[in-house]
C-alpha cells in the first residue's frame, strides 16, 4: 500500500546500468583514484568499489595517509590476468576465467581476502578433479593452506587410491619402501595402527638418529614385527633392534647410532610444490605428518599416501615371514606397486597413429581424451570419430557423425561436442550442425546456421557457441559475419562482424576473450589477429603473428596461445609461435617434427597435441606432442610398463 502523498518508484534497471557504467569508467580511466601495479602492469580502479570487495585493499586504503589522493598498491606476486578477472568481478559481479587461469585467480582472491571468489574457484577445481590430476590439486591446496579444499581432495584420494596408484603423477612421487619381517603366525595390524607405528619410526629416525627423509628413501628399509605387536628397527638376530610401538602405540626407543651432524635434505620432485600455480606464496605447514589414504592391496602388502615432515609421498610396505624365510616366498607385487618401480622406468615408443589419415578435421578435448572427428583424405570425406587416451596411447572409435564433414572446427559446450558447417565433399557450404552426447554415444542435429559457411572458426565462450568468419559458397572469399548459438534457447543470433574478412583461421578462447588468428582473406594468407570482447561486442586488432598462415591450429597452455603449422601461400609449414596476452607479443617457438596444414591442435591435460593434417605430399594420421620444458615437439610418448 502506497502512503498517501508519497511517490515511490523502483528502477529495476538502475543497478545493472550503474554497474556497467562504473566498469566503463574504470576501463577508460575516468575518476579512478587507485593504481594497482601488478608485475609491471598498471591497472586503474576506484577505491570505493575495491574496498567493498576486498578486505585486504580496504585495510590498505583505510590506512592511507592521503585519502584524497591517488593510492598506489603493489601486487607483484600475482598474475595480472587473474587480477583483471577480479577487477571485472568487483564491478560486474560476474566471475569469468579461462580454466587454465583459475588457480591464479584463486591465489589472487586469497591474497585480496575475497573469500567468496576463493571458494567458487576451489569448487570449480574440485569439479574438474580426476584420478590423473588429484595429486597436483592436493599440492596446490596444501600450498594455499586451504583446509577445506585439502580435506575434500583427501576424501577423493581415499576413495580412489588404487586407481590413482596407476597414474603418472603418483609414480613420480617420492617413495619410502619398507619390508617388515614377521614372526611365524603373526599378521600385521590394521592400516591405521600399522602406519601410526611407521610414522613414529620415521620421526625417530629423523629427529633422534639424524637420518634425512631422502636417505631413508634411498633403499628398502627392513623392520621386524614381533609376536607382542612391537615394530623393531633392524634385524633382531643382530641384537641391535629398536622398538617402535607396542599394543598401545606408545613409542619405546633405544638409540642405536649417534645423531648425524648434517642437516635434513629437501626431497626433490613434486612432493610439496604448488605445481600449477607459480604465483602462489603459501607454503605447506612445517613438520606436517599425516596419513592421507591407505589400502591393503594383497596379503601383507600395503600402499599408503602420507605427508612425512611436510613431504607428500608414497609408503610401500610389504610383510613377509621371518628373516630366515627364503626371499622367493615374497608375494609378487604388481609393477606399479613394487619397490622396483621408479618414475624413470618408462617405455619410449612412437605415438599410436589414428586409424584414418585426416586433414581439415575437428579436434577437441573432452573428459581428458583427445577427440578427432571427420576431415578428408585422398579417398573420401569422413564421418568417423576417433578418441585418444593419453594414458594408454590408444585410439578407439566413437559413434560416427550423421554427415561426412571436413574443413570445420569443433568445440565442447556444457560437456557436449558441437560441429557446425564445413564441407561434405560435394557441397562447400554446409549449414547443418550436430551435437555429440558422450552419455549415450550418439549425435543429434542442432539448428541450422544463419549463413552457410565452410572453413569457419568455432569456439565456446561463456556458455555459448560462436562461429566466426569462414568462406562463401564459392570458397574464394572470406566472411566477416559472426553468429552465436545459445544452447538454452537453441537459437542462433548475430554478433559484431570481424574487422577483416577471413577463412581457414585458428580460433580459441583465452581469459574470457575469443581470438581469431591468421587465415586468408581470399587466398592471400594473413598474419593479423583479432580479439573479441563479449562484454561490449567488439573485435579489436592486436599484435600480428610473425608468419602469415592459413589452416593453422591453435591451443592454450599456461595462459598463452600456441599457433602451429598451416600453409604460408606456397608450402605446408611446421613453425610454431606463442602469444603472451600480458605482453601482447608473439614469439617463435620450436618447430613441429612435420609440416602440417589443416591439422588439429589441442591441449589435453597439460600437453599440446598435433594430429593429422597434410604435409604437402601426404595426408597424415600421425600424432606429436609439445614439451614446454625443452621447447621441442616429439612423435614419441613415454608410458609405464606394468
UniProtKB/Swiss-Prot annotation:
Biased composition (Polar residues): 265-281
Keywords attached to this entry: Cytoplasm, Cytoskeleton, Kelch repeat, mRNA processing, mRNA splicing, Nucleus, Phosphoprotein, Repeat
Domain notes: When the BTB domain is lacking, AHR signaling induction promoted by IVNS1ABP is massively increased; Thus, the BTB domain inhibits AHR signaling induced by IVNS1ABP. Dimerization is necessary for proper splicing activity of IVNS1ABP and this is mediated by the BTB domain. The BACK domain is necessary for proper viral M mRNA export.
PANTHER family reported for this sequence: INFLUENZA VIRUS NS1A-BINDING PROTEIN, KELCH PROTEIN
Span of domain BTB: 32-99
SUPFAM superfamilies noted in UniProt: Kelch motif, POZ domain
Protein name listed in UniProt: Influenza virus NS1A-binding protein homolog
Induction: Decreased expression in various organs and cultured cell lines by doxorubicin treatment which may reduce mRNA stability.
Pfam families attached to this UniProt entry: BACK, BTB, Kelch_1, Kelch_KLHDC2_KLHL20_DRC7
List of residues that carry Phosphoserine: 246, 277, 322, 336, 338
Tissue: Ubiquitous expression. In the heart, the highest expression is detected in the ventricles and the lowest in the atria. Expressed in dendrites and spines in neurons.
Gene Ontology BP term (one): intrinsic apoptotic signaling pathway
Gene3D superfamilies: 1.25.40.420, Kelch-type beta propeller, Potassium Channel Kv1.1, Chain A
Family per similarity comment: Belongs to the BTB-kelch protein family.
Alphabetized InterPro entries for the sequence: BACK, BTB-kelch_protein, BTB/POZ_dom, Kelch-typ_b-propeller, Kelch_1, SKP1/BTB/POZ_sf
Consequence of gene disruption: Mice develop normally with no gross abnormalities. However, they display marked sensitivity to doxorubicin cardiotoxicity with increased number of cardiomyocytes apoptosis. Analysis of hearts from knockout mice reveal vacuolization and edema of cardiomaycytes.
GO cellular component: cytoskeleton; cytosol; nucleus
